[in-house]
């Protein structure tokens, strides 16, 4: 996520003071582009986890120090390239940067040197150890010490020594000049009677990885990334539910007014936290999922007073929250290759007839579920949250003693239907007069609550898991609502975790279909539609037997229901799934009067909220691919007066925790609350609608063909090529997945092509072939490279050249007037049109050379040309040699700790990617594959970094399975191999014939 911040830059010219005021400096964008030096920053070499914990214990943050106590936070502009190096050599004693409480962050005998690149560049990690700097003789399995590895072995150490010698010389040469310059400027300032500090201001943008994604290590700690722990005390004067997540506090607000002060833009939860954390510097914090978790013992004691709780809590009346119901969905696949599956949307009292002899892969799309061993929700239980999980027959304890038994599934129950706040009550039995504690979020260590060992537990709302070990380890006990009082000993409840629903999702955005039922629970007469309905009474008027809407089933797409006709009034989002009665659409005060479907890029979402009614002015916040449950807690405020949706579809809520009235926000600008359908400026929470990857055995291409126009008549699904359509004549199409090539012939007797991209084609005219007979349908393979094409004025790709990377609606216009005679398609897929403005006959162009365009196409020349719009899809990248997947490891909240390696299939977001603009972007961290330091040398490691679009982040996949870097065609993705700890890490290497570790397969999700 990119969060711009305005900093007040002050250059300290007083060289007589020996106290160092800053350890970091940032360079302006102009100097970033031209600077050949980097910032040197010392940091502990080993045990990075110890470093992060020490950083958390300190009362100040390295990146966000307390501005009141550190006036010299230097976002300084270096006067020259050498001045920047000199400045950091001069401030080598990192332990003096902050007070004594913070010095432990930096004190280390063994130190590691990092290169911190300017904001648009990726980091270079240079280790003093020989294992890191000198490339292993086993760069990848089977190399066995190739000559190219040995030649580059000494490069890092030589570069490091060269930089060190240069910095020492610069220090000697410029030390005297720097002091003299400082004294002169100080004398001028004193003479003028003004402050000797020179104030500068610059707009700096920090690129922060998305901190909301918890990282799960490779062990069996399924909930190791859960970091949400808050409680509420039952004192009548206060309600201590704290709304926001700590990860959301990593957002910063920004002031577009360049004359505002630094502290005015930092008066948020961060500033308050830094102020209050000083009083607790002696206590140790806990880190979960890379996000700071304050010691629960500080403010979760029953004896604490309301005044002491006030910095950490917020008065909220849970009863006033109006929860929005949501549908559930779970898909059960056969474990070993069979295409058999079962889709579950509601409770299944008896599932014993379902056959999964080898086990099942269960994908929970939405909601939380409980599997039972026996019918009617009896027997052993298994809790499932959103995500994938493999279950074999051993999920039942008794089956482990009887290997001959098959996989058993008795019944299924859905336990969460909205985003309501979970509440569990802990009441000490030894002290009846003591106030009970109400917990709302995960507690990794219940012992830190300092509650008696003998405690009674009551679940007020939601479903909770009680673990016998801290940090959510061991066999959990399921605690459900309305099941009375639980008597649990301290040994059985060391940590607590509530089940919670995930974000808004859509699986098949183009598969638009809704079925209306006359009665609740999907009974009575039905009506279905797949287009906008601006008036439900008019739509139902033709069916006299249909008397109102009792229940709704959304087959595909994401829809909005409106309280009034013509898409006005209150709004309610309809996700894919079942809405069994009117309470499922309880957000609307009246019946549904109109429906509308939503279309957008659901992979990348970006929005800006403004506190001013004038766009691009005042305080605002940028949000990318992240949901925020409490905008007030991050310091933005409760009122939003204008909105700019840059991409995706967002849902804003009138209340916190995604409760209350909903406002659907599509791409565009909203200048006041009337524009988004609100009754006031109040918006307290917001979240995007995101594309959900499909499960295993789902088709990568899907097209629905209809025998009549307007999606009427007989319907046939196509998932692969059909070479003969003589027995079925399609008249309209729904292209749901992938792109397709339609082959047809007209009266001239020649075959022609027509490309169908993802979308809806109500008739053949919308396809581009109004009077034609369709003969064949062919899916078009996905490509993972940026499009590039060259048109030539002479045959055989000679003469004047017109190079294109984007669409041109007229090649023959007065500006270009290019008469194409030959074509060289360098990369990507292109569509050539005979006429201008993408009209007329079409031809799909794949990478090759066409020496004579007229002989190839039968056209005189090209009228217009554009790249084919490949649909946005999620993918997994599998290494052929190791049969393992490209995986993100480390903490997504800290780019320095993240690395890229290969590991076995896990089903987690850390193995899911998507390709756009030449970038492979991780779904877990929203960062890109990046060659560390941009070194175009074999053996350079590949890491993750925020998108900056430079060549080191761009990749293309060739047809032979190699993934090459835009830095050089002679650099391809490889696995390092060898016997060291980093043997599974990914590097770039020279392409070698027959080297299977350099071959990758793309799995479309």
UniProtKB/Swiss-Prot annotation:
SUPFAM superfamilies: gamma-Crystallin-like, Ricin B-like lectins. It comes from the Eukaryota. Residues 871-1003 form the Ricin B-type lectin domain. Residues 132-159, 173-198 are annotated as: Disordered. Residues 180-189 have a biased composition (Acidic residues). Keywords: Lectin, Phosphoprotein, Repeat. GO terms for biological process: eye development. Transmembrane segments: none annotated. InterPro entries: Beta/Gamma-Crystallin, Beta/gamma_crystallin, G_crystallin-like, Ricin_B-like_lectins, Ricin_B_lectin. Belongs to the beta/gamma-crystallin family. This is Beta/gamma crystallin domain-containing protein 3.
């Amino acid at each position: 996520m990119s969060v711009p911040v305005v900093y007040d830059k002050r250059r300290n010219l007083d060289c007589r003071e020996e106290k160092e005021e800053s350890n970091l400096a940032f360079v302006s964008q102009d100097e970033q582009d031209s600077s050949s030096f980097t910032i040197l920053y010392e940091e502990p070499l080993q045990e990075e986890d110890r470093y992060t914990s020490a950083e958390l214990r300190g009362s100040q943050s390295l990146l966000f120090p307390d501005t009141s106590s550190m006036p010299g936070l230097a976002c300084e502009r270096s006067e020259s390239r050498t001045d920047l190096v000199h400045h950091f050599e001069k401030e080598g004693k990192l332990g003096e940067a902050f007070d004594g409480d913070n010095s432990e962050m930096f004190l280390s005998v063994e130190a590691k040197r990092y290169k911190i690149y300017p904001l648009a560049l990726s980091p270079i990690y240079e280790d003093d150890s020989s294992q890191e700097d000198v490339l292993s003789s086993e760069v990848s399995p089977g190399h066995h010490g190739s000559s190219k590895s040995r030649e580059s072995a000494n490069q890092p150490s030589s570069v490091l020594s060269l930089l060190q010698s240069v910095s020492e010389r610069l220090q000697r040469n410029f030390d005297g000049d720097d002091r003299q310059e400082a004294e002169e400027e100080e004398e001028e300032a004193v003479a003028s009677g003004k402050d000797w500090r020179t104030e500068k201001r610059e707009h700096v943008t920090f690129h922060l990885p998305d901190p909301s994604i918890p990282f799960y290590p490779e062990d069996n700690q399924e909930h190791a990334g859960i970091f949400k722990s808050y409680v509420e005390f039952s004192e009548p004067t206060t309600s201590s539910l704290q709304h926001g997540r700590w990860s959301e506090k990593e957002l910063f607000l920004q002031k577009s007014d360049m004359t505002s002060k630094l502290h005015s833009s930092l008066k948020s939860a961060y500033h308050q936290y830094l102020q209050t954390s000083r009083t607790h510097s002696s206590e140790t914090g806990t880190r979960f999922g890379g996000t700071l978790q304050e010691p629960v013992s500080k403010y979760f004691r029953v004896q604490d007073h309301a005044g002491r709780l006030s910095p950490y809590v917020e008065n909220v009346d849970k009863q006033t929250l109006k929860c929005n119901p949501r549908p559930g969905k779970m898909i059960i696949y056969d474990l070993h290759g069979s295409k058999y599956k079962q889709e579950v949307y509601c409770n299944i009292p008896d599932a014993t007839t379902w056959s999964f002899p080898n086990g099942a892969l269960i994908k929970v799309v939405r909601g939380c579920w409980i599997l039972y061993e026996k019918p009617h929700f009896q027997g052993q239980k298994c809790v499932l949250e959103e995500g994938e999980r493999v279950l074999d027959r051993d999920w039942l304890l008794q089956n482990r003693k009887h290997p001959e038994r098959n996989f058993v599934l008795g019944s299924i129950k859905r336990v969460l239907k909205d985003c309501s706040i979970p509440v569990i009550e802990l009441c000490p039995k030894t002290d009846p007069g003591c106030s009970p504690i109400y917990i709302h979020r995960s507690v990794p260590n219940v012992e830190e609550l300092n509650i008696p060992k003998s405690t009674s537990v009551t679940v007020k709302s939601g479903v909770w898991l009680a673990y016998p070990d801290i940090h959510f380890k061991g066999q959990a006990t399921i605690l459900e609502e309305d099941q009375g009082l639980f008597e649990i000993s301290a040994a059985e409840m060391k940590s607590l975790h509530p089940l919670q629903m995930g974000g808004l999702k859509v699986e098949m955005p183009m598969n638009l279909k809704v079925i209306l039922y006359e009665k609740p629970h999907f009974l009575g007469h039905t009506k279905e539609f797949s287009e906008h309905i601006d008036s439900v009474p008019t739509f139902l008027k033709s069916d006299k037997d249909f008397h109102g809407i009792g229940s709704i089933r959304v087959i595909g797409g994401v829809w909005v229901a409106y309280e009034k006709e013509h898409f006005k009034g209150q709004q309610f989002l309809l996700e894919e799934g079942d809405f069994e009665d009117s309470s499922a659409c309880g957000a609307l005060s009246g019946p549904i009067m109109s429906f509308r479907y939503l279309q957008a890029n659901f992979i990348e979402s970006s929005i800006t909220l403004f506190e001013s009614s004038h766009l691009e002015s005042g305080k605002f916040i940028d949000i990318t691919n992240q949901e925020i449950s409490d905008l007030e807690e991050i310091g933005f405020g409760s009122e939003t007066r204008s909105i700019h949706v840059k991409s995706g579809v967002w849902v804003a809520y009138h209340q916190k925790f995604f409760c209350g009235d909903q406002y659907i926000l599509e791409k565009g600008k909203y200048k006041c609350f009337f524009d988004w359908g609100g009754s006031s400026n109040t918006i307290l929470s917001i979240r995007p609608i995101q594309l959900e990857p499909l499960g295993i055995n789902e088709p990568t291409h899907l097209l629905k063909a209809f025998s009549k126009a307007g999606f009427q008549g007989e319907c046939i699904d196509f998932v692969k090529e059909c070479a003969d359509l003589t027995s079925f004549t399609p008249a309209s199409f729904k292209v749901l997945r992938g792109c397709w090539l339609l082959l047809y012939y007209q009266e001239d007797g020649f075959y022609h092509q027509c490309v169908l991209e993802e979308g809806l084609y109500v008739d053949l005219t919308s396809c581009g072939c109004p009077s034609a007979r369709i003969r064949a349908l062919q899916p078009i393979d996905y490509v993972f490279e940026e499009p590039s094409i060259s048109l030539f004025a002479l045959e055989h790709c000679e003469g004047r050249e017109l190079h294109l990377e984007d669409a041109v609606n007229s090649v023959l216009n007065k500006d270009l007037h290019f008469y194409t005679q030959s074509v060289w398609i360098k990369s990507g897929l292109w569509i050539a049109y005979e006429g201008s403005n993408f009209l007329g006959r079409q031809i799909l162009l794949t990478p090759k050379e066409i020496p004579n365009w007229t002989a190839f196409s039968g056209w005189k020349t090209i009228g217009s040309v554009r790249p084919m719009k490949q649909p946005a899809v999620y993918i997994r990248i599998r290494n052929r040699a190791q049969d393992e997947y490209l995986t993100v490891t480390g903490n997504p909240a800290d780019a320095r700790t993240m690395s890229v390696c290969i590991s076995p299939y896990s089903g987690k977001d850390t193995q899911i990617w998507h390709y756009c603009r030449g970038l492979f972007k991780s779904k877990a961290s929203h960062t890109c594959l990046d060659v560390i330091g941009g070194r175009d040398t074999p053996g350079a490691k590949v890491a993750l970094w925020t998108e900056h679009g430079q060549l080191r982040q761009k990749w293309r996949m060739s047809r032979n399975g190699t993934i090459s870097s835009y830095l050089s065609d002679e650099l391809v993705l490889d696995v390092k191999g060898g016997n060291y700890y980093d043997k599974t890490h990914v590097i770039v290497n020279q392409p070698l014939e027959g080297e299977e570790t350099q071959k990758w397969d793309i799995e479309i999700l």
